[in-house]
Swiss-Prot record:
Belongs to the heat shock protein 70 family. InterPro entries: ATPase_NBD, Chaperone_DnaK, Heat_shock_70_CS, HSP70_C_sf, HSP70_peptide-bd_sf, Hsp_70_fam. It comes from the Bacteria. Induction: By stress conditions e.g. heat shock. This is Chaperone protein DnaK. One of its GO terms (molecular function) is ATP binding. The modification Phosphothreonine is found at residue 200. Acts as a chaperone. Pfam families: HSP70. The keyword ATP-binding applies.
Length: 646
């Protein structure tokens, strides 16, 4: 069985790790980086770029370069968070037929799981290149506060990428695994994981206990905000720069898509620089132009100014921390360690705020960019049965229930319940002779069902006529280890039953997923063909260059007929190189190599003659008689064959 890899599918950056024995290994991608930007670009010729190459061309292709797709995954178009992003993103967010938020690129509608699958495919390929074998199984992380629809959509993304997702695991829990596994401390420890990433914020309170030599990680509570992260910090800087530039130059950059893309890049860079320095220059020449000519942008940004711009965002992370502590039934002083995860936690003001709330210095021995992927790889090893000394007990982040009479939310499973779990409750009809009941499943903490997130609905039909309150309908909620919900309803009188796996009443259908999987496989085949064509071209161009160089140096030694033959073969190959026909390029390359054989022999003969002349001259100079007799002793009488590489 192959390895189960661990993937941190991040809003801004993604990371992949594996276990080698008892050691974890974060794998470098093809560019040599340990994290990959979660950016996907769709080129005019149909090529899809992922990671650093997509990021590099974003300024010139903003409408077809998708970033932060994770903020849209499993979300409805009408949700206020999505509506807010529509005005900020340079690409088009559109409403799918099922009401989900999708993205439109080059006239084609794409689902967020389909876009995220491109990043997962890059992570899969990174692991395969390193391991030298196919990878088909993965543990993928999600924010702890992701709801059922978002978890399901992430799992779908894995399937589209050709991965069997063995487990969806919460990011803070994964970070705790990475932190706690190598700690030798005996006794129980309570840790707080503060995870502020590119697009989401989570906090989890986790107890690490030693139980008979086994490390037990039990999540006591979790809380967060799935629409708060580094992207929002960048936006505050962008808004500030736009305002300052408008004051100085009287030009509004907010409607200029190309300028916005450059501003985004500059804002991210400035934010990172200000974690280590007190001031930075944002310098963007030729940012725009008007009737008076080109305009240049040069603005100084201090750390103090940045902190004042984002103070309210940092403050927003504290309320979930307070709730998580309360839900865990402990006080702040009970926390032994605070772990920071996510790139945004490098910001000094964030660290200061965390220290102020928890009353202790956060740990510095956890890599905020890599800990989550490492934890996912550890969980992969546990699931494959190679590791027996770890037990992970996670929780469901939000309450789950059904709508009952009067639109009330009747909670079946409360938030922070350890998963997997199962719960059944008996309900009855609300009217006389009611032939069917509709079970509407919601997720959230509000008392009125409609104020929560509707996950799905189904009917149980064929209930025999009876007065209200008589039929006995048993509703069962079953949450699996991925945090994904399965709901069943059974009429106890007739034994009639109906079950569904909650796939948000929108989400991707099985047919859509299968189609996307096929498209992805076709893309992979196309990519392979493109690569083979590039390699054939490179080989052909190298042959043309070598033969032309040799002709200019030794062509005069050839008969006119031989020289013309080689020149004709060069022309044929040059013509083939302009086409997309790999077979023709290969054929003409072979023909040129065959035609230029005589030229090679002439060059070889000339070189040998020159060496012989040099040797004779040297021998004459040295008196030459002593070594003459033995001059053939070192020549081996054998033929050397060219080994053709396949």
């Amino acid at each position: 069985m192959g390895k189960i890899i661990g993937i941190d599918l991040g809003t801004t950056n993604s990371c992949v790790a594996i276990m080698e024995g008892n050691n974890t290994r974060v794998i470098e991608n093809s560019e040599g980086a340990r994290t990959t930007p979660s950016i996907i670009a769709y080129q005019e010729d149909g090529e899809i770029l992922v990671g650093a190459s997509a990021k590099r061309q974003a300024v010139t292709n903003p409408k077809n370069t998708i970033y932060a797709a994770k903020r849209l995954i499993g979300r409805k178009f009408e949700e206020k968070e999505v509506q807010k992003d529509i005005d900020l993103m340079p690409f088009t967010i559109t409403r799918a037929d099922n009401g989900d938020a999708w993205v439109e690129v080059r006239g084609q509608k794409l689902a967020p799981p389909q876009i995220s699958a491109e990043v997962l495919r890059k992570m899969k390929k990174t692991a395969e290149d390193f391991l030298g074998e196919p990878v088909t199984e993965a543990v993928i992380t999600v924010p702890a506060y992701f709801n059922d629809a978002q978890r399901q959509a992430t799992k779908d993304a894995g399937r589209i990428a050709g991965l069997d997702v063995k487990r969806i695991i919460n990011e803070p829990t994964a970070a705790a695994l990475a932190f706690g596994l190598d700690k030798q401390d005996k006794g129980d420890r309570k840790i707080a994981v503060y995870d502020l990433g590119g697009g989401t914020f989570d906090v989890s309170i986790i107890e690490i206990a030693d139980v008979d030599g086994e490390k037990q990680f039990e999540v006591l509570s979790t809380n967060g905000d799935t629409f708060l992260g580094g992207e929002d910090f960048d936006q505050r800087i962008i808004d500030y720069i736009i305002g300052e530039f408008k004051k100085e130059q009287g030009v509004d950059l907010s409607k200029d898509v190309l300028a916005l893309q450059r501003l985004k890049e500059a804002a991210e860079k400035a934010k990172i620089e200000l974690s280590n320095s007190a001031q930075t220059d944002i310098n963007l020449p030729y940012i725009t132009a008007d009737a008076s000519g080109p305009k240049h942008l040069n603005i100084k940004l201090t750390r103090a100014k940045l902190e004042s711009l984002v103070d309210e965002l940092i403050e927003r992370t504290i309320a979930p921390c307070r709730t998580a502590i309360k839900d865990a039934g402990i006080s702040v002083s009970d926390i032994n360690d605070v772990i920071l995860v996510g790139g945004m936690t490098r910001m000094p003001k964030v660290q200061e705020k965390v220290k102020e709330f928890f009353g202790k210095e956060p740990r510095k021995d956890v890599n905020p960019d890599e800990a989550v992927a490492v934890g996912a790889a550890i969980q992969g090893q546990v699931l494959s049965g190679d590791r027996k000394d770890v037990l992970l007990l996670d929780v469901t982040p939000l309450s789950l229930g059904i709508e009952t009479l009067g639109g009330v939310m009747t909670k079946m499973i409360t938030k922070n319940t350890t998963i997997p779990t199962k719960f059944a409750q008996t309900f009855s009809t609300a009217e006389d002779n009611q032939p069917a009941v509709t079970i509407k499943v919601f997720q959230g903490e509000r008392e009125i069902a409609s104020a929560n997130k509707l996950l799905g609905e189904f009917n149980l039909e064929g209930i025999p006529p009876a007065s209200r309150g008589t039929p006995q309908i048993e509703v069962t909620f079953d949450i699996d280890a991925n945090g994904i919900l399965h709901v069943g309803a059974k009429d106890k009188g007739t034994g009639k039953e109906n079950k569904i796996t909650i796939k948000a009443n929108s989400g991707l259908s099985e047919d859509e997923i299968q189609k996307m999987v096929k498209d992805a496989e076709l893309n992979a085949a196309d990519d392979k063909k493109k690569l083979e064509l590039v390699q054939a071209r490179n080989q052909g161009e190298a042959a043309v260059h070598t033969v032309n160089k040799s002709l200019s140096e030794h062509g005069d030694k050839l008969d006119a007929g031989e020289k013309e033959k080689i020149e004709a073969a060069v022309k044929d190959l040059e013509a083939a190189l302009k086409t997309e026909d790999k077979a023709a390029i290969d054929e003409k390359t072979t023909a040129l190599m065959a035609a230029s054989q005589k030229l090679g022999e002439k060059m070889y003969g000339d070189a040998q003659a020159a060496q012989g002349a040099e040797a004779a001259a040297a021998q004459a100079a040295a008196g030459g008689s002593a070594g003459a007799a033995a001059q053939d002793d070192n020549v081996v009488d054998a033929e050397v064959k060219e080994v053709k590489k396949g």
